[in-house]
UniProtKB/Swiss-Prot annotation:
Gene: CALML3
Note: Binds four calcium ions.
Protein name in the entry: Calmodulin-like protein 3
Provenance organism: Homo sapiens (Human)
Record bears the keyword Chloroplast: no
InterPro entries: CALM/Myosin/TropC-like, EF-hand-dom_pair, EF_Hand_1_Ca_BS, EF_hand_dom
Family to which the UniProt record says this protein belongs: Belongs to the calmodulin family.
Single annotated GO MF: calcium ion binding
Binding site for Ca(2+) 4: 130, 132, 134, 136, 141
UniProt domain EF-hand: residue ranges: 8-43, 44-79, 81-116, 117-149
Job description of the protein: May function as a specific light chain of unconventional myosin-10 (MYO10), also enhances MYO10 translation, possibly by acting as a chaperone for the emerging MYO10 heavy chain protein. May compete with calmodulin by binding, with different affinities, to cellular substrates.
Residues that hold Ca(2+) 1 according to the record: 21, 23, 25, 27, 32
Amino acid sequence: MADQLTEEQVTEFKEAFSLFDKDGDGCITTRELGTVMRSLGQNPTEAELRDMMSEIDRDGNGTVDFPEFLGMMARKMKDTDNEEEIREAFRVFDKDGNGFVSAAELRHVMTRLGEKLSDEEVDEMIRAADTDGDGQVNYEEFVRVLVSK
């Protein structure tokens, strides 16, 4: 996984890691992990940090060495890429940029993709995704549909 990072990314991660490795022993504490990740443009929640630590701190000593950190950051970067792809897909459907996909917008995009859908089929797609019942699909609903596939 870490081999998918560029040399520049590895260098950037090493610099950030070193900033928080106060005593130079090659390890940072779990508390410092969130600070390091935020300095690299990630925004992990407390729950995500706990999950990451339990995943990478195999010996349970409360510290993370650089190879463990690098593997975790590679996974996190991959997740971020996937999220950006989903946001981009949503923007394709959300023609007017109002944060919602209407039946008309869905029909327009599907037609451009070569899918000739009946009004009933488009309405059914909207109904299936529209969990709050407002007649259109917001970003959270859009993600839920994509992730459930």
